[in-house]
Design a protein with these regions (language model features):
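Bilayer-spanning, highly hydrophobic alpha-helical transmembrane segments
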Residues: 10-16, 20, 126-152
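Short alpha-helical linear motifs
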Residues: 63, 78-88, 132-138
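Membrane-interface, cytosolic juxtamembrane amphipathic helix immediately N-terminal to a transmembrane helix
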Residues: 101-143
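Juxtamembrane/interface alpha-helical elements of multi-pass membrane proteins
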Residues: 2-74
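Amphipathic alpha-helical interface surfaces
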Residues: 56-59, 88, 107
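A structural signal for well-ordered alpha-helices, especially hydrophobic packing surfaces
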Residues: 46-49, 67, 71, 96, ...
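Short, non-transmembrane cytosolic segments of multipass membrane proteins
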Residues: 76-105
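Charged, amphipathic alpha-helical oligomerization/scaffolding segments
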Residues: 37, 44, 91, 110-113, ...
Length: 152
């Protein structure tokens, strides 16, 4: 009976240490997913700037309170009959907040630069996540084994 309880205790220690390491590894992977989501939003922003200049100008004006043609319905935003996702509109507003004047050609160049920087960040974050995940999983498992040996 005592031996069985020791085995169960050791199993719980190993499992909990593994789950702790797995949780830390998952945090790194979530950072990569967040960067990928931001990059996808940036690419959609680039499409909007390229294909809907009139709507973009309206959103730009609405960011500064000089235009009321922006209306939210069912999680989407309608600007002069153009359907944009609400999160994309927020991205646009954040992007336009840094601008003084609207010049769509230079904004496309800015978006391209930002997109390239995000790609580099994603690549480095993926490498960091892979390395850190292995380290956290290995270390947590070794700690679990160490504690288990100490209990025995």
């Amino acid at each position: 009976m005592y031996f069985t309880l020791k085995i169960i205790g050791i199993a719980f220690i190993l499992l909990s240490s593994f789950l702790f390491g797995y949780g830390k590894a998952l945090a790194f992977k979530n950072r990569v997913l967040e960067l990928k989501r931001i990059h996808a939003g940036t690419l959609r922003l680039k499409e909007y700037v390229s294909n809907c200049p009139a709507e973009i100008e309206t959103i730009y004006k609405s960011c500064y309170g000089s235009c009321k043609d922006v209306e939210f319905t069912n999680g989407k935003i309608i600007v002069k009959q153009a359907h944009l996702l609400k999160e994309d509109c927020e991205l646009l507003k954040e992007f336009f907040a840094t601008l003084g004047a609207l010049d769509l050609n230079s904004e496309c160049a800015r978006i391209n630069l930002y997109s390239e920087l995000l790609k580099k960040q994603i690549i480095s974050a993926e490498k960091e996540a892979a390395e850190s995940s292995k380290i956290w999983l290995t270390c947590s498992f070794c700690v679990g084994i160490g504690i288990s040996i100490f209990i025995i």
